[in-house]
Structures are given as structure tokens and as C-alpha cells.
């Protein structure tokens, strides 16, 4: 992409075709002069006419190269735009999954609170070996569920941050595409309206 930028700057050094109108006007004057020239001046006028025609053809080719380069850049932007859209869709899916997991974590938390209340009630009664073992197992399960819930919450927060970043990226990319198309339209419209009459005039002779 950096190489294309360098090429474009070199191609646009003429001012994006601003001098084409002057070239065509000069070419037409030279053509008329050649048509009215004497035999002595005929060859010199003809060579000058060919040189000016070559300059016009070069300017047209340069504009076509700029247009092709802009088309490639637009295609690259559109491709990147689609990739970002896919990433956003994937992020939405992951966020939906995380929300589901978060609801499950909340349910686990409610169960934990119920288990804690039950454990407190059990501890009020004389301890028994089996009851103590069950409570110990419940505590292990609850600790594991708590860790799972905390992990899910952290993952959800991370996905939210990634989603916001993707949204900002797509907005910036869209702005770049719009600016590129606007610049291209401004550069090409004058060129097309000037070149066509010149071509018709040459073909008629």
C-alpha cells in the first residue's frame, strides 16, 4: 500500500490533469497551423504536432493509471470492510453466548446462596460424619462454580471491549472509502469531459 501511495504522488505531480485543457488547445492550434503550413514548414509543424499528441496520450495514460490504482484501493477497502463485518457478526455471536453463560452463572450464584443457607442450618445440629463430608463436597463444588462464573464475567467484558473496537474500525474504514470515492470523482470528471472532443476532432481530419 505504501508503494501505491508513492506512485500516485508521482502520477499526480501535474495537478491531476489540470494542464490537459491547455495541451489540447495547443494541439488544435498546432494542427490548424500544420494544415495551413507551406511545404517548407510542413515537416517541422508535423513533428511538433506528433510531439504534442504524444504528450496528450501520455497524460491520458497517466490518468488511466491513477483511476486503475484507485479502483484497486477501493477493492482493498471493500474487502477489509467485509472482513470487519464478519468479525462483528462473530463478536455478536460470542456476546450472545457470554450473556447466556452469565445468566447461568447468576443461577449458580442463587443456588450457592441457597446452599450456604442450608449449610448454616445444618451446622446448627449435632455434627455427623456424613453430613460434614457432604458439606465439604458442596463447598468444593460451589468454589468451582464461583471460579467459573468469574471467568465468564471476565470473558464477557473482554468481548464487549473487542466489539466496541470493531465498531470504531468499521466507521473509520467507511469514512476512508467515502473520501477516496469523492477524490476520484473530482479528479476524473474534468478529464473525461475534455478528452472526448479532442479525439473526435482528430478522427474527423
UniProtKB/Swiss-Prot annotation:
GO-annotated cellular components: cytoplasm; nuclear speck; THO complex part of transcription export complex
Region Disordered, annotated ranges: 181-205
Subcellular localization, as worded in the UniProt entry: Cytoplasm; Nucleus; Nucleus speckle
Source species: Nematostella vectensis (Starlet sea anemone)
Name of this protein: THO complex subunit 7 homolog
Tree of life domain: Eukaryota
Function as written in the Swiss-Prot or TrEMBL entry: May act as component of the THO subcomplex of the TREX complex which is thought to couple mRNA transcription, processing and nuclear export, and which specifically associates with spliced mRNA and not with unspliced pre-mRNA.
Coiled-coil zones: 68-158
Amino acid at each position: 500500500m505504501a508503494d501505491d501511495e508513492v506512485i500516485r504522488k508521482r502520477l499526480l505531480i501535474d495537478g491531476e490533469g489540470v494542464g490537459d485543457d491547455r495541451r489540447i488547445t495547443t494541439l488544435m492550434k498546432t494542427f490548424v497551423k500544420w494544415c495551413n503550413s507551406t511545404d517548407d514548414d510542413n515537416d517541422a509543424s508535423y513533428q511538433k504536432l506528433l510531439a504534442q499528441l504524444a504528450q496528450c496520450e501520455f497524460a491520458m495514460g497517466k490518468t488511466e493509471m491513477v483511476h486503475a490504482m484507485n479502483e484497486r484501493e477501493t477493492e482493498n477497502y471493500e474487502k477489509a470492510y467485509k472482513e470487519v463485518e464478519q468479525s462483528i457478526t462473530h463478536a455478536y455471536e460470542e456476546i450472545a453466548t457470554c450473556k447466556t453463560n452469565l445468566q447461568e452463572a447468576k443461577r449458580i450464584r442463587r443456588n450457592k446462596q441457597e446452599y450456604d443457607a442450608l449449610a448454616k442450618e445444618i451446622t446448627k445440629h449435632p455434627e455427623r460424619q456424613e453430613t460434614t463430608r457432604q458439606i465439604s463436597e458442596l463447598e468444593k463444588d460451589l468454589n468451582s462454580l464461583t471460579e467459573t462464573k468469574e471467568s465468564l464475567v471476565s470473558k464477557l467484558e473482554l468481548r464487549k471491549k473487542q466489539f466496541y473496537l470493531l465498531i470504531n474500525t468499521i466507521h473509520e474504514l467507511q469514512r476512508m472509502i467515502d473520501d477516496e470515492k469523492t477524490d476520484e470523482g473530482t479528479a476524473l470528471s474534468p478529464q473525461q469531459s475534455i478528452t472526448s472532443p479532442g479525439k473526435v476532432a482528430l478522427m474527423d481530419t
